């Protein structure tokens, strides 16, 4: 069974006014997202998830990660995103990103892990007023990558304290 690397990175100041940090990037549907690596515990390939009766629709179930029970969240359902469309010959490279949010751990389902990138804080732009998919209140900013954008999520705003408490009690 693959457990993926446990990621332990810290922000590295590059210069007095130019702080660089790392983002774990992944695909959800047709969009590319990033999360500050400081909030990521590890990345795990798809495993068995046990459904939970009466859980919110966006909760896929729970996952046993080395004797620790982790709730698994489907951001497609939470934010009404389209599922990834796979062409013949495409390989599904999905799994979970295990996050540390407040004092809780939770997993989010991803369609495809991309890579870890270093980004300068000045490269992060405010999110556009009109953005499709995930609401602007959950977005830290966007980073231009060639002709497209990487949406940087703020994991501390994805769930309220009350929601995190409910997830911890599943």
UniProtKB/Swiss-Prot annotation:
One Gene Ontology CC term in the entry: cytosol
Protein's UniProt keywords contain Cell wall biogenesis/degradation: no
Residues of the CheW-like domain: 20-164
Keywords of the record: Chemotaxis, Cytoplasm
Species for this entry: Treponema pallidum (strain Nichols)
Protein name: Chemotaxis protein CheW
Subcellular location: Cytoplasm
Pfam families cross-referenced by the UniProt entry: CheW
Domain of life: Bacteria
Free-text function comment from the UniProt entry: Involved in the transmission of sensory signals from the chemoreceptors to the flagellar motors.
Disulfide bonds: none
Entries under InterPro entries matching the protein: CheW, CheW-like_dom_sf, CheW-lke_dom
Biological process per Gene Ontology, one example term: chemotaxis
């Amino acid at each position: 069974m693959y457990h993926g690397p446990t990621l332990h990175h810290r922000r590295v100041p590059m210069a007095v006014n130019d702080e660089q940090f790392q983002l774990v990037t992944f695909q959800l549907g047709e969009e590319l997202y990033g999360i500050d690596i400081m909030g990521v515990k590890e990345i795990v390939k798809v495993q068995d998830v046990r459904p939970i009766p009466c859980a919110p629709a966006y909760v896929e179930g729970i996952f046993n990660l080395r004797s620790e029970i982790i709730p698994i969240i489907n951001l497609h359902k939470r934010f009404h995103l389209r599922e990834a469309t796979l062409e013949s010959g495409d390989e599904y490279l999905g799994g979970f990103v295990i996050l540390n949010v407040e004092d809780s751990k939770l997993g989010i389902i991803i369609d495809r892990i991309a890579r870890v990138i270093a980004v300068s804080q000045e490269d992060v732009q405010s999110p556009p007023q009109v953005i499709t998919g995930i609401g602007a209140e959950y977005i830290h900013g966007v980073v231009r990558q060639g002709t497209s954008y990487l949406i940087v999520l703020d994991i501390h705003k994805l769930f309220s304290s009350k929601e995190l408490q409910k997830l911890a009690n599943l």
